[in-house]
Amino acid sequence: ATGGERAAGPFLQMDLAGYRASFDKLWGYTNVVRLGAEHLSDDGNIVLVSGAPARRAKPGQAAIASVGGAVEQFVRAVTAELAPKRINVVSPGVIDTPMFGNDADARAKMLGGATANNLIPRAGTPEEVAEGIMFVVKNGFVTGTTIDVDGGWILS
């Protein structure tokens, strides 16, 4: 997931203020949609980003899974209200970004372990996520859906 703070770790030990702050991403998205939709042309579209844990969470991912799930359900809930304008979600899996640190060896080891069981056993790239976003931007017949860009992580 992108944007906002991210609480991680076991839910029962998680700082609830951090968990609550994780939802800043959702509130930001709802504000963008609510205030921005009226400025879109009828063939305009909005793309939000969730994350694979929204539909397949691992231990320690309660916050990111909850927020991502809320983002995806929000999109499904408002799609009919926005039509003919379109709104979709792109859901990345593990993506190789500086968020995972600057030490190349440690980063490669961590990403390798995190993606070893993917159907495509590697981390994705920011460019691959951008291609997923551009797909839903360009395809005028796609609305109210979630596109996974996760190397098959959600199915593995």
Predicted regions span which residues?
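Conserved NAD(P)H cofactor-binding loop of Rossmann-fold oxidoreductase domains
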Residues: A1-A8, G151-G152
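Rossmann-fold scaffold of SDR-type NAD(P)-dependent oxidoreductases
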Residues: A1-G4, L48, N88-P92
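Catalytic loop of short-chain dehydrogenase/reductase
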Residues: P10-M14, G18-V33, H39-A83, V94-I95, ...
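PG/GG-rich flexible active-site loop of Rossmann-like NAD(P)H-dependent oxidoreductases
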Residues: A52-P53, V89-M99, N118, A123, ...
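Conserved Rossmann-fold SDR core element
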Residues: E72, E81-T97, V142-V149
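Conserved loop-to-helix N-cap of the C-terminal "lid" that shapes the substrate pocket in Rossmann-like
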Residues: V89, A108-L111, I120-A130
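A glycine/serine/threonine-rich, flexible loop-to-helix segment
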Residues: I95-N117, S156
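C-terminal substrate-recognition "lid" of short-chain dehydrogenase/reductases
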Residues: R122-V149, I154
